[in-house]
From Swiss-Prot:
Annotated GO biological process: photosynthesis
Family: Belongs to the PsaD family.
Record protein name field: Photosystem I reaction center subunit II
Lineage, broadest ranks: Bacteria, Bacillati, Cyanobacteriota, Cyanophyceae, Nostocales
Name of the gene this protein is made from: psaD
Originating species: Microchaete diplosiphon
Signal found in the keyword field: no
Regions that span the bilayer: none
Gene3D superfamilies assigned to the protein according to its UniProt record, in alphabetical order: Photosystem I PsaD, reaction center subunit II
Amino acid sequence: AETLSGQTPLFAGSTGGLLKKAEVEEKYAITWTSPKAQVFELPTGGAATMQQGQNLLYLARKEYGIALGGQLRKFKITDYKIYRILPGGETTLIHPADGVFPEKVNAGREKVRFVPRRIGENPNPSAIKFSGKYTYDA
């Protein structure tokens, strides 16, 4: 299991709180590197000050990590990673799963739902309707 390192951001008020579920089932961690200390908004409500250098924040849900990643992009911080941590301590990188963000080109990434034709070459939907095929398979 990968060990995560970094400083926890400074909380000025409410942290938004971790759910008890995070200790019993699973929790999520997001790590990022900041060029300077700056205030950011937490996805659970409230605000915190990120430390200069490596930061580590534990969250109760993956969606909070994705939302915080969007906040970090406003600060031109794009090296964030989101991990799932199981109660046994097992750590798994979940975003970006293959090391490259989804909107970037990755030579090894397989195309998903790719159909090699232009939109004008699509078959007539009425010809497919009762044929048993799906429109995305035709």
